[in-house]
Regions:
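Hydrophobic membrane-insertion alpha-helices, especially the h-region
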Residues: 13-16
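Bacterial N-terminal signal peptides that target proteins for export
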Residues: 1-11
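Extended repeat-based scaffolds of very large eukaryotic assembly and lipid-transport proteins
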Residues: 22-152
């Protein structure tokens, strides 16, 4: 009987205090369990919010990072910009800023959106890059931002 009480208390503690803090990455993990050959194509079939979650997971938690997963999001061009700006404004972590900047750099290079002509967006990106804490990421992102400015 004591073991049952202990198990019940333990499960209540874990359920009450630990589970809410755990992040659920089932969507992302299932995506990466599938064959790698058609990942980019498969990602195109997901809605933007899920594409973004999978992209971030593949960039931040996988080695080597799956930077090519920026392509399906970048292909959406102007339709993805409001969502990405919302993500940019809600994130302060250097890695999130880097990931979002990578999508915009992919948009610029693929010409799916004229990033450099969007002065409000460029100002927001510049501000976020300037505020980055990690010097190495800040340098890398500054170069990425300059490539966007130089894109033609």
């Amino acid at each position: 009987m004591l073991n049952i009480r202990f198990a019940l208390v333990r499960s209540l503690l874990f359920g009450t205090f630990l589970l809410p803090g755990c992040e659920d990455h089932e969507l992302e993990e299932n995506f990466f369990k599938q064959p790698p050959a058609d990942r980019v194509e498969r990602l195109r079939r997901y809605p933007l919010t899920d594409q973004y979650k999978i992209f971030r997971y593949g960039n931040d938690r996988k080695e080597p990072p799956f930077m090519d997963l920026a392509e399906p999001i970048a292909e959406k061009g102007a339709t993805a910009v409001p969502f990405l700006v919302e993500q940019l404004n809600s994130e302060s972590h250097d890695i999130a800023v880097r990931d979002i900047l990578l999508i915009f750099a992919t948009m610029a290079s693929s010409k799916s959106y004229d990033v450099k002509s969007d002065s409000v967006l460029m100002s927001a990106l510049s501000s976020k890059v300037s505020a980055m804490k990690d010097k190495d990421w800040k340098d890398i992102c500054s170069k990425m931002l300059q490539r966007i400015r130089d894109s033609g």
